[in-house]
Amino acid sequence: MWGLCKNHFPSNKIQVQERNKALKPKKSGSEHKTKQLFPVFNCKKKEKGVMIRFAILRNANTSLLSARSICLFTQAPTYCHVRLNTLNKSITTKRNSLTESKRHVHDGKHFFTTPHQQQQTKLGEIEEGHSPNIKGEDLRSIGQAITHQRNKRRKQIWSAIFGGIFGVILGYSLIYRVIYLKEQSFLPLFPSSKIRKLSTRDLKKVDVNQVQKLSKLRVLEILSGHDMIKEQYGVPLLDKDGNSPTLNEFSMWCEDQDPCVTGIVMEPDDKRDSSHTWYRIPFVCKWRITHRPISIRGTIDDLLNRIGLETSDLFEIISPERVYGSFKYEYPLQGDSHALHLWFHGEIELDDDSLIVYNGKYHVDVKLQEIDLFRREKNGQLIQYVLYKNEAGDK
């Protein structure tokens, strides 16, 4: 074995130096550039070889290639070699870092933020629902679902509010007033007009035939003294057949003094006879729909009486119209605590082209408000002539 390796392991110092020169690596282009960039690290000391001997047993079987590889790798590195290798590694790492940073910079916004931070921001936007990949149809469907849910919630709230109010009112009117206290209760529904027709019950208390006769006499009396009627129709006033004029149309209605409402009247089911038509709920109550006025002054009086006061203690209302024809002296229907105006309307036909129309109020006597003559002239025009009008009357 020693004979095979004697060329690689010289015996004297001169041979060692020559061997080191032969094994000294040649300068490459990269190393030459490195020495130019870093001249401080130029090695001036001579390289020294290292003599290593291997003791191999005689009986051991070792191939020639193994022995040659051992001889080649026994050359120990010098200080300059180690330093050059370190510098080469540092330069390559710097170049790699610069190339990687250049690859990451796509536009100017990465000078102050790294791509990693931008990726985290995009992920956060996607989690919040601001992803650009979401379609417009999906956004509209989401918006419609939110709007539908809000409307549904709003309807539930309003239904609960109105249901609670209706339950409180119905419970007080029906359960407390009618069933518990055994009293009459009125539940208002909606406002109604002051003017209404006389009911069957009201007509029983008013003599309509008497009002009709009195109104006709008052109209003929006023027309007989009118100059136009005297000249064109003559006195006494007669119809086309030469008879006294007759009423073709006559009607009456009432007008309440206060605002009116339409509502439901409820009473205990006592099965007593009544002039009104009632609808019954067996063993609970009876009810009907009616009109009732709302007396503001009466409501104020009731509130003051509950706290021990009266209206006269605070103020006094003085009406300047304390004369016949005001509401104070109008016809009160039986069973009502408020005054009413009883109005009437009539038509008297004089001939085919002439018609007398009048209206007024009734209390104890008839009080006419207006008398008009409707006549069709020869040219075919229908003209209204106002023959009488009560300017001081309340309409």
Curated annotation (Swiss-Prot):
Indicate yes or no for the key word Mitochondrion: yes
Keywords in alphabetical order: Membrane, Mitochondrion, Transit peptide, Transmembrane, Transmembrane helix
| GO CC term, one of those recorded | mitochondrial membrane
Q: Which domain of life is it from?
A: Eukaryota
Q: Where are the transmembrane segments?
A: 156-176
Q: What is its main location?
A: mitochondrion
Where located? Mitochondrion membrane
Q: How does it sit in the membrane?
A: Single-pass membrane protein
Family (UniProt): Belongs to the AIM39 family.
Q: What is this protein called?
A: Altered inheritance of mitochondria protein 39, mitochondrial
Organism of provenance = Saccharomyces cerevisiae (strain RM11-1a)
Q: What is the lineage of its organism?
A: Eukaryota, Fungi, Dikarya, Ascomycota, Saccharomycotina
